Amino acid sequence: MFSKLTPLAETGIPTLSCANAAGRLLHSDSRQIKQGDIFVACPGEYADGRSYIPAAVANGAAFVFWDDDGKFAWNPEWKVPNQGIKDLKHRAGILAAQVYGNVSDGLKFWGVTGTNGKTSITQWLAQAADLLGEKTAIVGTVGNGFWGALEETTHTTPAPVDVQTLLYRFRQQGATVAAMEVSSHGLDQSRVNGVSFRSAIFTNLTRDHLDYHGTMEAYGAIKSRLFYWHGLKHAVINVDDEYGAELAGRLKKDCPDLAVYSYGFSEQADIRIIDFTASSDGIAAVFQTPWGEGKCRTRLLGRFNAQNLAACIALLCANGYPLDNVLDVLAKIRPASGRMDCIMNSGKPLVVVDYAHTPDALEKALATLQEIKPQGAALWCVFGCGGNRDRGKRPLMGAAAVQGADKVVVTSDNPRLENPHDIINDILPAVPAPECVEADRAAAIRYAVEQAAANDIILIAGKGHENYQDVQGVKHRFSDLEIVGQALLTRK
């Protein structure tokens, strides 16, 4: 699907390997360059990396790859070896993969894409694979690294050179498996070019990022690229999702050598959920699969998490792990941070912090909590919408909150460069009788915790694991989990 560069041996640039690359890394950020590193300079979304070649050279770059668009000229005063490459922006990942010796070829590499569920599935796959004897690296929204020791990241899917540098480091640290969240932006901007995916999961397609993609058709087309990836062996598709069902059928026709596994509650699913129960203690489900039938009971919440478990079962069994072992380890997994994260204090309301920031995700989170809500109790929803993003999503979020919750508190999310009150005003037409409107998110959370009855449930939606709030381009320290903890502590 993607063109490949001339082998580096033919260009005179040595291919690095785990044996000879000590300390020599590739970077597309000049600030990360250290003595002996390689700088990759190409136009970006916000800045032109070629403008930072002098800084990279000053920091000790030993070699520079630069985007040759026919207009840019190398300055001979930059006295380091270099090579211009046409269309480097889209080829940088493949270049970096070759320089590092195609390290992803030596990993069981699993990609997860879809609007919702990427983080949970990726984190669960990593936990499960570790319990099955692997050493699993994670690349995703919550962070990059190994389970329990993730380093914060700014993008769900990093820049192409950064992806390959991460994989190189993971291999040096003994990784045998990598699980990656693959965003639509990452696919569209060629960030995963050069990655050798073995297996891929499609979770669902619901409204998000239309400020970027324009239409749902374009959004879906970008997501589907992952399943036509060169060398992909397994495609795991949610057929409870309308687009997923269409994609699964298309792949079976288009890719005869690709093993396609469908999952869900649907009778047509290969990995089918045939029994499901939910309580405040968690969920239990029976799965019918090509590898046999089995039950899994977990502390996770939500019907959608039974679907996510089915995706994990399909991918792990397709990769050769026995079904009984897979079910055993999945019963032990812990939720990803900020994903249906429950904070319980005796005699106080149950508070659930979740990353739900799309109408579909909010609807499902609220439906899950309605199922376990005590009789006579109220379900609260505290939410906002992000600034400088799809405005059309805002009333849809409001409608989802009104439909699913008994009491709605409208507040801010990450307003970014917008006025928080303008964002709230876009939401309010869909929320005719809010319990509270409070632009200060911390105050809104405290209000819900203080006013809710002891047996009520409160969903704090939108930010999940995030430890900042983006206001006027500045990321201020802010954590829903911390604010909830403080509010519960001081609740009378």
Swiss-Prot record:
Binding site for UDP-N-acetyl-alpha-D-muramoyl-L-alanyl-D-glutamate: S30, T156, T157, S183, Q189, R191
Residues annotated as binding ATP: G114, T115, N116, G117, K118, T119, S120
Pathway in which the depicted protein is active: Cell wall biogenesis; peptidoglycan biosynthesis
EC number per UniProt: 6.3.2.13
Residues binding meso-2,6-diaminopimelate, per UniProt: R389, D413, N414, P415, R416, G462, E466
Catalytic activity: UDP-N-acetyl-alpha-D-muramoyl-L-alanyl-D-glutamate + meso-2,6-diaminopimelate + ATP = UDP-N-acetyl-alpha-D-muramoyl-L-alanyl-gamma-D-glutamyl-meso-2,6-diaminopimelate + ADP + phosphate + H(+)
Enzyme class: ligase
Motif window: Meso-diaminopimelate recognition motif: 413-416
Disulfide-linked positions: none
Compartments where located: Cytoplasm
Pfam families attached to this UniProt entry: Mur_ligase, Mur_ligase_C, Mur_ligase_M
Post-translational modification: Carboxylation is probably crucial for Mg(2+) binding and, consequently, for the gamma-phosphate positioning of ATP.
N6-carboxylysine modified-residue sites: K223
Biological processes per GO annotation: cell division; cell wall organization; peptidoglycan biosynthetic process; regulation of cell shape
Record flagged with keyword Ligase: yes
Keywords recorded for this protein, A-Z: ATP-binding, Cell cycle, Cell division, Cell shape, Cell wall biogenesis/degradation, Cytoplasm, Ligase, Magnesium, Nucleotide-binding, Peptidoglycan synthesis
Principal cellular location given in the protein's record: cytoplasm
Entry cofactors: Mg(2+)
Function, in words: Catalyzes the addition of meso-diaminopimelic acid to the nucleotide precursor UDP-N-acetylmuramoyl-L-alanyl-D-glutamate (UMAG) in the biosynthesis of bacterial cell-wall peptidoglycan.
HAMAP family listed in its UniProt record: MurE
Annotated family: Belongs to the MurCDEF family. MurE subfamily.
Listed name of the protein: UDP-N-acetylmuramoyl-L-alanyl-D-glutamate--2,6-diaminopimelate ligase
Organism: Neisseria meningitidis serogroup A / serotype 4A (strain DSM 15465 / Z2491)
